[in-house]
């Protein structure tokens, strides 16, 4: 079921870019675009502005996720993936990109740099206890189930 996310343009770095949209009927994410040109040297990370601020409905969040094509073709990913946009955040959405490749990568203003996925949030109530229920996995982590 669709939810309405209000969008405001911010930054005024040039003519308005098109609003994020789903590129296919089955797409989970809306494409976010760079609102200014940026070149990332190998190993460099940078916060890239999108020119958008959002009003996400209460009970929902936005997740900013990397685009797989950028990773495959250029070695570009996100430092904090996914990045979380809380429903009460009203500032400009930025994407922290990093170039893991061997060559500089340039994005023009308007290039697609990430995806925005809107989803529900479940808030937990924590209960402090003396013991936890046992499980088949126990305390094994960090690849322990792949032996």
Curated annotation (Swiss-Prot):
One GO term of the biological process aspect: dUTP catabolic process
Keyword Hydrolase set for record: yes
Cofactor(s) the protein needs: Mg(2+)
InterPro entries: dUTPase, dUTPase-like, dUTPase-like_sf, dUTPase_trimeric
GO molecular function: dUTP diphosphatase activity; magnesium ion binding
Pathway(s): Pyrimidine metabolism; dUMP biosynthesis; dUMP from dCTP (dUTP route): step 2/2
Binding site for substrate: 67-69, 80, 84-86
Reaction(s) the record says it catalyses: dUTP + H2O = dUMP + diphosphate + H(+)
Keyword Metal-binding belongs to the record: yes
Gene3D superfamilies the record matches: 2.70.40.10
Pfam families the UniProt entry points to: dUTPase
Leading EC class: hydrolase
Keywords on record: Hydrolase, Magnesium, Metal-binding, Nucleotide metabolism
EC id: 3.6.1.23
Task performed by this protein: This enzyme is involved in nucleotide metabolism: it produces dUMP, the immediate precursor of thymidine nucleotides and it decreases the intracellular concentration of dUTP so that uracil cannot be incorporated into DNA.
Family (UniProt): Belongs to the dUTPase family.
PANTHER family assigned to the protein according to its UniProt record, in alphabetical order: DEOXYURIDINE 5'-TRIPHOSPHATE NUCLEOTIDOHYDROLASE
Protein name per the record: Deoxyuridine 5'-triphosphate nucleotidohydrolase
Gene: dut
